[in-house]
Amino acid sequence: MNNQSATMNTKDNPLGYKKESTLLVGFAIPCIISMLVTALYNIVDQIFIGQGIGMLGNAATNIAFPLSTTCTAISLLLGIGSATNFSLYLGAGEKNESEKYAGNGIVLMALFGIFLFLVTTIFLTPMLKFFGATNDVLPYAKAYTRITAFGFPFLIANTGMSKLILADGSPRYSMISMLAGAIVNTILDPLFIFVFNMGMTGAALATITGQIISFSISLRYKFHFKTIKLSRESFIVSAAHYKKIFILGASACFNQIAMTVVQIVMNNTLSHYGAQSIYGGDIPLACAGIITKVNMIFMSFVIGISQGTQPVIGFNYGAKKYARVGKTYLLALGAASALSLIAFACFQIFPRQIISIFGNGSDLYFKFSERYFRIYMFLTIVNGIQPVTSNFFNSIGKSQLGVFMSLTRQIIFLLPLIIIFPIFMGIDGVMYAGPIADAAAAIVCGYFTIRELKELKKLEINLTKC
């Protein structure tokens, strides 16, 4: 990368000189809203399905949820991978390369979306059974997923393109594209479920309608990039560009894949050990689904903050402004930790009230839900560390550490504990696996972060001497 062009570019681009806290707020808020919209597509369905269909409907959306996280994983792989490269080369003053990463990223989003739709349509029933569907839940899950699969290409493309739009310096446009679809989904859900009596099918139709509208708005931006101009050459397939997109998007993708794997294992564990308890198999599935969706709302804020740092950190690292890189990370970590404290208080004080939003149930249902909520989410207070740290390493081009950070909680700690603990503790083992994994992941991330911040300080000192 050309040092002279990078120095000149930082004078022209506000990412290189504007106050870090101002930039973080400007980029994080649209990212948070974007993440909230993604969460709301799931949680709004869950609320109206719970009120209109009941516990089996809630369990069905939980069974289908791994497919939603798979879509998110793919969109983050391609969206963050292309956007990170986009920012790094833009910061270095190489606009031609930025254009190629944007174009290649969009092509990949389209191809992966169509592929996932075809795979889901062909293997729907065995997939849902693999995800943990019981005989009672399966018909509801099939009715819902058969239709939402049509929206996968639009969901992947829209979520992925929103990262490029953000990296181009248009956080408000990214926010509007996501928000428009969520509003439509929220309006259509009660209309289709309650007025037209369409049940799970209605909820699914409302979801894909919102996704198509969001995609249409994002697609329009392809012709209106501010810092680059896409041409036919930008979309020409390049193995070298694909490879770097995959490398720098892997961290965020693996984090979502890890969530998917954990969700599948957890569903099967809950139904298996639940059947051996007083709760039965369906109550734990429904409760875990609700708690997962509620946690998504909290994590939308945390992940939104971490993603909001990506253009700032990526640009300044490419421009060798290391002090700004470290300061942006610490600001994001502080904001995420403050939100984690608020979430912890809500989860511990108001579990029954939160569960009640998603419909009624038996006393046994609420007893299990409250207990699960309080124990599993007990160390929410440290949950902001891992995603912010993972995104930090990814944004400075250290993808291997980013991937490792993204896997700490879900795969390295939580997954083994979910499998091992219930052998000795029954269904309670799933609950206690959560806080132990949270604590272990926070310690590991803290160690590597302190080491990296010291390295950034050394680089800044050496640069000043030169």
Predicted segment positions?
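Transmembrane helical elements of multi-pass membrane transporters/channels
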Residues: 26-45, 147, 158, 181, ...
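Hydrophobic/aromatic residues in alpha-helical transmembrane segments
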Residues: 29, 45, 82, 123-124, ...
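Hydrophobic transmembrane alpha-helices of multi-pass small-molecule transporters
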Residues: 70-73, 185-190, 215-219, 297, ...
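Helix-terminus/linker motif at the lipid-water interface of multi-pass membrane proteins
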Residues: 40-58, 128-135, 191-198, 260-290, ...
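Residue-level signal for short hydrophobic patches within transmembrane helices
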Residues: 21-40, 44, 67-74, 150, ...
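Short alpha-helical transmembrane segments in multi-pass integral membrane proteins
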Residues: 1-28, 86-153, 195-250, 313-379, ...
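Short runs within selected transmembrane alpha-helices of multi-pass transporters and secretion channels
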Residues: 79, 148-166, 174-182, 203-216, ...
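Small-residue-rich hydrophobic transmembrane alpha-helices
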Residues: 58-118, 155-174, 267, 285-351, ...
